[in-house]
């Protein structure tokens, strides 16, 4: 079986680049002079990705240590001020830096933000009202600018990466995004777009069979629409679809679909083993990696050209073991 997700990047001259809040990489840039080093990022993702670190607060000239800042006022357009009530207001400086930086992230294929940060928090950031009470409805100023300027860029915050499903989904989206960027750099063509779709069919099916059919129908109009416009519409929809986690039921549907390609190639005993292990996954008795590994074993013995192209079987490096907990 081919391993497209790795071959295109891991064996090449460059690794996929991820933006990361600097404190998560161990940089002592927090207001108290400390850091929030994240083991998963550094010790696991760090072996496969190149990190580009950002600390908006240090970038605008705030020292370390420094008074902490917090968001106040309107949840939709809060101001970033000192928590000490000393009159320090860095809103404008943060917004200018964030807007300028967010427009220059073309080389990144994903971003991991520091949760709860008034500059980097992706969601549920505290915003204080006049009464001093806080609502957890805000977004950090820098994180908001990055997401607005790069709406298709896969983003997460480190706290959510503790969830195995969210973790696997994020990394999978990063690799899809990277493959798309590589396609665009090599030159968009009708063939390249159709090849991209073909290789991602089962991955899309695992997330949404309806969207999989919708995207196929969209590409069926290639001859009647501008390639650039249609490609943009296509990839926007792909990233929307992949943002929702694939359910166990839909994974089972894909596994059974793959099994169909082996029905004439394997004997009754091996077919029964495959059916049994897929059912064990359906019942939550084994993780997703188990039926996929067994299917890959049989496809190595009985290669199928269409199946060998499917990103679903190898959406990210095996060494990350992201499907071992799904």
Give the ranges of each region predicted by the language model:
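Conserved, mostly hydrophobic/aromatic
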Residues: 20, 113, 284
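Glycine-rich anion/phosphate-binding loops
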Residues: 86-106
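Conserved acidic residues
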Residues: 16-17, 109
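Short, hydrophobic/glycine-enriched beta-strand segments
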Residues: 17-24
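Acidic, Ser/Pro/Thr-rich low-complexity regulatory regions
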Residues: 154-326
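Flexible, glycine/proline-enriched loop segments at strand-loop-helix junctions
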Residues: 27-31, 85-90, 126-137
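Internal, conserved structured core segments that host functional sites
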Residues: 103-185
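N-terminal glycine-rich anion-binding loop in soluble enzyme alpha/beta folds
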Residues: 28-29, 33, 37-79
């Amino acid at each position: 079986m081919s391993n497209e997700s790795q071959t295109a990047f891991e064996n090449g001259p460059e690794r996929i680049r991820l933006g990361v809040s600097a404190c998560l990489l161990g940089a002592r840039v927090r207001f108290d002079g400390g850091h929030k080093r994240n083991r998963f990022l550094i010790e696991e993702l760090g072996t496969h990705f190149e990190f580009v670190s950002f600390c908006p607060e240090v970038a605008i000239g705030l020292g370390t240590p420094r008074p902490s800042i917090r968001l106040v006022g309107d949840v939709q357009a809060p101001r970033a001020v000192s928590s000490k009530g000393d009159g320090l207001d860095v809103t404008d400086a943060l917004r200018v830096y964030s807007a300028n930086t967010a427009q220059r992230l073309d080389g990144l294929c994903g971003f991991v933000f520091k949760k709860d940060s008034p500059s980097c928090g992706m969601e549920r950031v505290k915003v204080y009202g006049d009464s001093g009470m806080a609502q957890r409805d805000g977004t950090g100023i820098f994180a908001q600018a990055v997401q607005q300027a790069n709406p298709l860029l896969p983003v997460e915050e480190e706290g959510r990466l503790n969830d195995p499903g969210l973790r696997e989904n994020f990394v999978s989206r990063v690799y899809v995004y990277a493959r798309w960027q590589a396609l665009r750099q090599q030159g968009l063509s009708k063939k390249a777009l159709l090849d991209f779709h073909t290789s991602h069919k089962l991955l899309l099916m695992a997330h949404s069979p309806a969207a999989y059919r919708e995207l196929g129908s969209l590409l069926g109009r290639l001859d009647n629409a501008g390639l650039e416009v249609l490609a943009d519409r296509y990839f926007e929809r792909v990233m929307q679809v992949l943002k929702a986690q694939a359910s166990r039921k839909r994974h089972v549907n894909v596994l059974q679909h793959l099994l169909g390609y082996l029905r004439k190639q394997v004997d009754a005993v091996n077919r029964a083993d495959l059916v049994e292990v897929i059912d064990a996954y359906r019942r939550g008795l084994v993780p997703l990696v188990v039926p996929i590994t067994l299917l890959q074993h049989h496809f190595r013995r009985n290669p199928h050209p269409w199946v060998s192209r499917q990103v679903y079987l190898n959406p990210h490096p095996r060494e990350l073991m992201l499907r071992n907990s799904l």
